[in-house]
């Protein structure tokens, strides 16, 4: 417990909240342009070729975003919407691309969990 004199000398510092998605600048989503679309391998013990895109956001940040779902139509200069949310087995990937908006089309032939992949209700 500090003395009153110590508290006068230097006041208590408030605890700063550290955001997990700083590139969004407090917004729920951000628009951006793909600069590179490629695959990377996850860390142990998983094995796959995960699809990711390097995206330049309107906030000025250059980030790596995961492309969820099976198959995609993204290429360089595609305009995408990015949300927060990391991919646990891909180090440095802290954002997801929102499917079914802007240039990212929804996942083809998706029946369950459609809202997460931008798919309309089948007739």
UniProtKB/Swiss-Prot annotation:
One of its GO terms (biological process) is translation. Its main location: plastid. It is found in: Plastid, Chloroplast. GO terms for molecular function: rRNA binding; structural constituent of ribosome. Keywords: Chloroplast, Plastid, Ribonucleoprotein, Ribosomal protein, RNA-binding, rRNA-binding. One of its GO terms (cellular component) is small ribosomal subunit. Transmembrane segments: none annotated. InterPro entries: NA-bd_OB-fold, Ribosomal_uS12, Ribosomal_uS12_bac. With S4 and S5 plays an important role in translational accuracy. Located at the interface of the 30S and 50S subunits. Part of the 30S ribosomal subunit. Belongs to the universal ribosomal protein uS12 family. This is Small ribosomal subunit protein uS12cz/uS12cy.
